[in-house]
C-alpha cells in the first residue's frame, strides 16, 4: 500500500472513520436527549 492518497501523514480512511464515528455519536446524543426531553427544551 502506498501513501499517495493521504493528506499529510494521516490516511484518509482513518480520517473518515474518526469523523464518521464522531458524527454518529453526535446524532445518537441528539436523539437520546430529544427522547428524554432534554433536546426539546432547548
UniProtKB/Swiss-Prot annotation:
SUPFAM superfamilies: Photosystem II reaction center protein J, PsbJ. It is a single-pass membrane protein. Keywords: Chloroplast, Membrane, Photosynthesis, Photosystem II, Plastid, Reaction center, Thylakoid, Transmembrane, Transmembrane helix. Pfam families: PsbJ. InterPro entries: PSII_PsbJ, PSII_PsbJ_sf. It is found in: Plastid, Chloroplast thylakoid membrane. The chain crosses the membrane at residues 10-30. One of its GO terms (biological process) is photosynthesis. Its main location: plastid. GO terms for cellular component: chloroplast thylakoid membrane; photosystem II reaction center. One of the components of the core complex of photosystem II (PSII). PSII is a light-driven water:plastoquinone oxidoreductase that uses light energy to abstract electrons from H(2)O, generating O(2) and a proton gradient subsequently used for ATP formation. It consists of a core antenna complex that captures photons, and an electron transfer chain that converts photonic excitation into a charge separation. Belongs to the PsbJ family. PSII is composed of 1 copy each of membrane proteins PsbA, PsbB, PsbC, PsbD, PsbE, PsbF, PsbH, PsbI, PsbJ, PsbK, PsbL, PsbM, PsbT, PsbX, PsbY, PsbZ, Psb30/Ycf12, at least 3 peripheral proteins of the oxygen-evolving complex and a large number of cofactors. It forms dimeric complexes. This is Photosystem II reaction center protein J. It comes from Oltmannsiellopsis viridis. The lineage of its organism: Eukaryota, Viridiplantae, Chlorophyta, Ulvophyceae, Oltmannsiellopsidales.
Amino acid at each position: 500500500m502506498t501513501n499517495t492518497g493521504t493528506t499529510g501523514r494521516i490516511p484518509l480512511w482513518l480520517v473518515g472513520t474518526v469523523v464518521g464515528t464522531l458524527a454518529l455519536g453526535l446524532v445518537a446524543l441528539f436523539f437520546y436527549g430529544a427522547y428524554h426531553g432534554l433536546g426539546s427544551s432547548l
